[in-house]
From Swiss-Prot:
The gene is calF. This is Bifunctional decalin synthase calF. PROSITE patterns: FAD_PCMH (PS51387). The keyword Nucleotide-binding does not apply. Pathway: Secondary metabolite biosynthesis.
Amino acid sequence: MSFKPLLLSLSLLSPALGVAPRQSASCRAIPGDPEWPSTSAWNALNNTVHGRLKATVPLPSVCHHEPFGTYNEDACTALKTEWLDDRTFLNNAAEVMNPGTQNYSCVPFTSPSQPCQLGNYASYSINVTGADDVIAGIRFARQKNIRLVIKNTGHDFAGKSTGTGALSLWTHHLNTTEIISSYESAEYTGPAAKLGAGVISGNVYQVVAEAGYRVMGGTCPTVGLAGGYTSGAGHSLLNGAYGMAADAVLEWEVVTAQGEHLIASQSNNTDLYWALSGGGPGTFAVVLSMTTKVFQDGPIGSGIMLFNLTSDNTEEYWGAIEDLWAFLPEFVDAGPNTWDFALTSTGFQAYAITVPDQNGTQVKSLLQPWLDSIEKRGIQYSYTPTDSPNYLQYFSSRFGPGIAGAGPATVQLASRLIPRAAMYNATQKKVIVSALRAFIEDGEDLELGCHALNVGNIEHPGNAVLPAWRNAIATCNVVNYWDWNITATEMQARKDLLVDRLIPGLEEATPGSGTYLNEIDARWKGDWITELYGDNYDRLLQIKNKYDPEHRFYAWTAVGSDSWFTDGSGRLCRV
């Protein structure tokens, strides 16, 4: 096979292009360092993994004259549209759907005369087909002292699955789904599904539905279930029925940093099972597959509800929102229910009121106490009941069939868990609603999306899910969208507003709570050990040190990451 792409990438970050020399032997090597592997070393690794090593040539290289020589004006024009769609990134080894992480180093919207630099891209990727590929990649990274990252779909708000000069273990093509009609263990007997690490929500819902089941997964169909989603805890429209996605895990198939191919379950390698089930992705081991409970399918009752925010009803509108928060505990306690709603500058939308095994009319009856309060405030609303015979049809009606409902690749978000106890304290509730109101009134077209749930009373195995989830009434995301039509300085100002003012305001309004570790901005400045892991952190770090004593796996804000920093050239260095 041709190794031309390998040779191209080796020169991209040479010292002649401004990369500072490495200052310490405690840093991972990057291109341009004397220790960077030779072409023959990369070719040898490629032979070891049977031709599945790929040098990174960013998709937007077609928009730039140098250094790849792939400029194509027509292809670039098409890519400018495709770049806004999540699906563009799924089947490309090194791409991540996160404009902040892309960092303007090689994007379709900058001048063709600007060189296409790798920046935060991994330098090489192994298309993983099994444990042997992972073991080969880990061994090479250790021998050559280079950074190692784990990537699945690239659905990654925090930039954990890429890094300057990294070798990426790309698990996207481990995409098999096996239905197990009667899984048996000491802890559980019942239906399950074994999901390869590359399986995404939009596909697995279809497969399990055909077998008569439903499974917890993300609301974005491009989310990989057996990767960061579940290992980060995993919120779902079905949380009210079955707990967090991590609560349903039966076993993990992994390769550790020491090259061991293991099964982690409640009876084997139990500490690793505990850590992987909620303790965060990219740091304990490389997941090859996950076996999870699936659940008998059935109807889903729901409804779509809207009312407007106008200059004439501002105070009554926010009074209705405060009434909603007071009502949410009653709603989520009334059954296996969740409620996804959005607040924008134009009003309120409840787009996914999820009540398993009920119908839309029954759902409205559940909502009636709050609807009565809205009517008393003189607010006109619309409510449309919906009935779905199964979960797949329900999900598709809200988010699109398969991956057709994939969202924009321009989403920027940060999140916060809202404590349930605050809903019983009028003062605390007002403080929280005031913080949410600030997002809408001060946030320059920000949207606020909340997912209401109760996972505190659902039986679950011991795991590393952040304890604050068990005490939360909702998780709320603050969302805006990257605008490629404004300057980088203007876009940076929007990010500054989000991470420097608005999110800290919500954190101040919810002391002692926490944050969903999968939904943080790459520039988030919170106390990540406390906010993302809570009291679990010390035990998680012990497990990290046991299975990865050299800290070969690194991801920003992952367990153990406080032992590292990135220098001005992007090298990963020991503190």
